[in-house]
Structures are given as C-alpha cells and as structure tokens.
C-alpha cells in the first residue's frame, strides 16, 4: 500500500518539531493529527501565516500528544495494510521523513515493515519530465 503524507513542523536548523501530519492512502482513506506538544511560540513567520491559522480548533479530535500521533499513525497503517510492501511518498520529503520517524525515536525503532525512506514525489516528477 502506498501512503502519501505531508508534515508541518517548526525547525530552527538544529531541531525539527513536528506540528501536524496529514496522510492519505492510494485508495483515499485519510488521517490527520496535530501535536499538542509542539512549541508553536517558536514558529517562523511563514508557519505563523500559512499553517497556524489553518489548524483545527484545539477541541478537535485531531489534536493529541506525540505518543497519540504515533499510535494513530501505526493503527492507520495496520488498518490499511493490503499485504503488499508499504511505500511512503511525499513532496520534498527529507524533513518530513525525519519528523515522522522521530515519533518512534530513531529509525531503528520504526515498526516492522515501515520503510526507512520516503519516495520523493518531486524528484520522480522532475525525472519523468
């Protein structure tokens, strides 16, 4: 199964603090989670203008701590496992992959079957012409 995802995060050149993650399967099922642990006071002007105003109300069920994010993502993957190897896809995926993996600690702690890389949609698009 292919899972397409995008993360919003706050980064300062040394740390990547996951703010939210949206994920969709190739068949259209969706997951959206927002971190209650992200320090939004550190958001840069772009995130302040383009991300924070679009987040759901804090009472929305999408909000959870990092452990809750990890558990919901793991459940989503298990629920939509079609028996084929899992593929992760994202547009300009480098930081997204790191932010996702850090929910488990290091990459060695990822659940069995979760790839240690994300396919890069922008590179694929550029190479395809």
Q: Where do the model's predicted regions map?
A:
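Glycine-rich phosphate-binding "P-loop"
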Residues: 54-64
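Short, well-ordered coil↔helix boundary/capping segments
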Residues: 63, 67, 91-94
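Two-metal-ion RNase H-like nuclease active-site motif
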Residues: 2-10
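A short, well-structured juxtamembrane/interface segment
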Residues: 64-78
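Metal-dependent phosphoesterase core characteristic of DEDDh/y 3'-5' exonuclease domains
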Residues: 2, 16-18, 25-56, 75-129
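Short glycine/serine/proline-enriched coil/turn segments at secondary-structure junctions
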Residues: 11-15
């Amino acid at each position: 199964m292919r899972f397409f995802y995008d993360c919003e995060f706050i980064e300062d050149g040394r740390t990547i603090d996951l703010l939210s993650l949206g994920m969709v399967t190739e068949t259209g099922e969706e997951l959206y989670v927002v971190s209650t642990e992200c320090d939004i006071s550190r958001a840069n002007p772009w995130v302040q203008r383009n991300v924070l105003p679009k987040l759901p109300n804090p009472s929305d069920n999408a909000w959870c701590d990092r452990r809750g994010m990890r558990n919901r993502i793991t459940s989503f993957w298990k629920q939509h496992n079609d028996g084929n190897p899992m593929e992760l896809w994202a547009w300009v995926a480098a930081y997204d992959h790191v932010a996702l993996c850090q929910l488990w600690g290091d990459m060695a702690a990822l659940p069995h079957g979760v790839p240690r890389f994300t396919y890069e949609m922008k590179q694929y698009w550029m190479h395809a012409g």
